[in-house]
Amino acid sequence: MKHPIYVTADEAVKAVKTGDHIHLSSVASVPHVLIQALCRRADNGEVRDLHFHHFHTEGPAPYSEPRYDGIFFDQGFFLGPNVRANVNAGFADYLPVHLGESQKLYRSGALRCDVAMVQVSLPDENGMFSLGTSVDCSLAAVESAGTVIAVVNENVPYAYGDLVSPGLIDYLVKDNTPLVTKAFAEPDETEKLIGKNCAELVPDGACLQMGIGALPNALAAALTDHKNLGLHTEMFADGILNLIKKGVINGMHKKIDTGKVVASFLLGSEEVYKFIDHNPDVLMKDIKYTNDPWIISQNPEMMAINSATEVDLTGQISADSIGTRIFSGTGGQVDFVRGATMSEGGKSVTAFASRTKKGQTKIVPVLNPGAGVVTPRADAHWIVTEYGAVDLYGKSLQERAKLLISIAHPDDRNDLDRAAFERFGPHYHNFSI
């Protein structure tokens, strides 16, 4: 058992050695004070060849920047706008992994974790710390790392669920920098239609998984007349909070963690962070738990609602890339697709606008060259756009093509139909769905 001591950020990062692999707590809880201290060591020529691993991070990301080429090398599990350009320029990299398995990388030793840098709440009466808004795979990193540096921040909410024992920590650093908050754009008319179409698939008493952003917020707004919904998700934000406050989400029909909101990380307003602070109705859990398909499936009528960058006419779903350009990450999409479809009465839903902001169709004859298939065609079920919803489960390739074309943008349907005919031959036009 370790006996943590309080030190300054500059003193703490002296534990980092050249060649180390470093885990950063992510999303709203990035330990920027430690990153800044590490940059000072790098600027003085004290360390090099450091590898960073993390989920989506908010704020400056010097660990991915060209000026630290050869000194820092970023290998994130999920990309945000702060690292995306550097990854696609080759100054940083992307490590594909289902989020539910990200913790296994550390626990199995498949990925080194020499140093874990995390943010934690003030300790409770038993000396235990909460990882607050970012439990994800940070708990696994803390358990696996040779050295653990924890920033104790009074702005990190104390969330019930999986906690960190002080016996796992080497160094504690006090810093009360506010957590990053994020306001998402209001849904546009297209997103509102998609949200409405998704909401029509959600029965009262269902259990939800959804992400963050304008489209999930549109769905949340369309669910205000539903009753007795549950929440078991990897993350949530303000749209979900509104449903909880209105009593729409109460978890009364959940078969596991009944009455509890279960998540692994958050990003949103300060109100969301305050909501989880010492709230016994919220459990912030290890990603191993939240994203375990078997755990997910224990809740009946589980609704996994995710998005895509494009879908081809056979139902292959790309969500992490646009052609060869990495956009985000695999995320937990497949974890929840599998869990929802294993659930009694569950549904997997992939929702997106029929066209990009530039007017290009997202339902395509074939995926752009180099695009990653996140959800394979055999796992594709409900597909939703502003023009409707179709279920691909149990449908042949030609049947899928007809269904998908029916919810494509009207101006793209003729071209898609022609492409389907060229692919499948004359029989394609000889049957109806």
What does each of the following model-derived ranges do?
Residues 1-433:
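Conserved alpha/beta enzyme-core scaffold
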